């Protein structure tokens, strides 16, 4: 996998189609469906492929504007959250990209935006280039549920990535309700790992079961002593009651065994947490894994009390499709 271009790429992509992100309204997507903006895979070029409206493009593309104004798309994020940064990707759009773009946001507990909705500008107009990634950090701790993506005056954008921290009203969770505290939809975040050569570490926190091997976390073959690992920050502190390690689609490349450590972390940077994790207590002792299967652990879990972070160790290497860490929220 390619290296992270910017630090905020490690946050959850709130605009991922797999989380349910979709277009609510769009001024014009004549040439290319605006919902393609949210596909998790990189944009592709299809040489010589045309449809009824022109050249097929992997992204959102509007018609050439012949009057005043600009194009925009109203987006419902798959999960509300605070935004840390965005990537406006114009891959393969060369003579047809917008010269600039901006981003507005709002939070609605229910329903969709209308003409009375108050929008907050989170990214003022920025210049765009063709066939390029445009990374912009955003400093706003408010949670947003919808975006309005403006392009000036028209053109095409391949992907819109919106990285941030998912929002959940934890006060509404019942005292005895069991929640997947590691789920991306609940604010869980993969912080660091030993290796992610074949698949991103963040994939293991996505909803549903993996669609293929590429939709999981997979390391390179280990040729040195040791083992691979990934550290996850839980969406909320909690007491762990059940753990699911899913090796779906991993058959000749699943880990032989796994274990999990946990801790209640009160401070420190992501890099400091990586070092601290060596000394965390054992939450789940070493367990044998099988290929292409869900492994559920309950009785095997050690009672550590409330924790905020876990470290999944896989021995010696291999792939994991999903990790579920279920428990009760610490009030």
Swiss-Prot record:
Catalytic activity, reaction form: allantoate + H2O = (S)-ureidoglycolate + urea
Pathway: Nitrogen metabolism; (S)-allantoin degradation; (S)-ureidoglycolate from allantoate (aminidohydrolase route): step 1/1
EC number assigned by the record: 3.5.3.4
Gene Ontology biological process terms in this record: allantoin catabolic process; purine nucleobase metabolic process
UniProt keywords, alphabetically: Hydrolase, Purine metabolism
Pfam families noted in UniProt: Allantoicase (PF03561)
GO molecular function per UniProt: allantoicase activity
NCBIfam families: allantoicase
Membership in a protein family: Belongs to the allantoicase family.
Protein name, UniProt field: Probable allantoicase
